[in-house]
């Protein structure tokens, strides 16, 4: 047994340095959640960063609010964050978490950047769930559903971004 507190501290720090790097970057990407999961007997595998950066999808979008009156009994997202209905966030079944997507309401042309931090929707025929605030900004909160197009802008901590196409930097 080591009696010197400085040596004990050095051993603990050394063990932490050896242990934590192995779990800090799943899949080799900072800030990227790639765990598979199951809901109602259906298994889902999140796509790779490379797949996500090329991902675009058109489908039916809905909005959800898992918080209750004044935020009491508010749930957590798949990333462990509190559900915040006033934030511009959303849920997708297989995109990496977190990631930022550009959502376009094809019914009125409104566009919004949304951070995905949750899984869902788990209702057939829907490709994206948004918070009430995001749905309001896109103009479909009253209707409940809208046809939208999503395009991934960045994945994880923001280091992995869609490459711009075009010969000028602003195109």
Q: Which residue stretches match the model-derived regions?
A:
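Sec-dependent bacterial lipoprotein signal peptides
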Residues: 1-22
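Secreted/periplasmic proteins
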Residues: 23-171
């Amino acid at each position: 047994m080591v009696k010197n507190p400085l040596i004990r501290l050095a051993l603990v720090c050394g063990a932490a340095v050896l242990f934590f790097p192995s779990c800090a970057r799943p899949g080799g990407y900072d800030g990227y959640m790639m765990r598979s999961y199951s809901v109602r007997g259906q298994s889902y595998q999140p796509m790779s960063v490379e797949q996500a950066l090329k991902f675009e999808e058109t489908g039916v979008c809905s909005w959800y609010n898992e918080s209750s009156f004044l935020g009491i009994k508010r749930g957590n997202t798949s990333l462990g964050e509190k559900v915040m209905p006033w934030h511009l966030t959303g849920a997708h079944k297989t995109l990496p978490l977190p990631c930022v997507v550009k959502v376009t309401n094809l019914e009125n042309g409104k566009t919004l950047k949304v951070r995905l931090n949750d899984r869902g929707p788990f209702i057939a025929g829907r490709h994206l769930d948004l918070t009430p605030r995001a749905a309001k900004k896109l103009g479909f909160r009253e209707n409940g559903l809208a046809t939208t197009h999503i395009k991934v802008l960045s994945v994880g901590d923001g280091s992995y971004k869609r490459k711009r196409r075009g010969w000028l930097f602003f195109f």
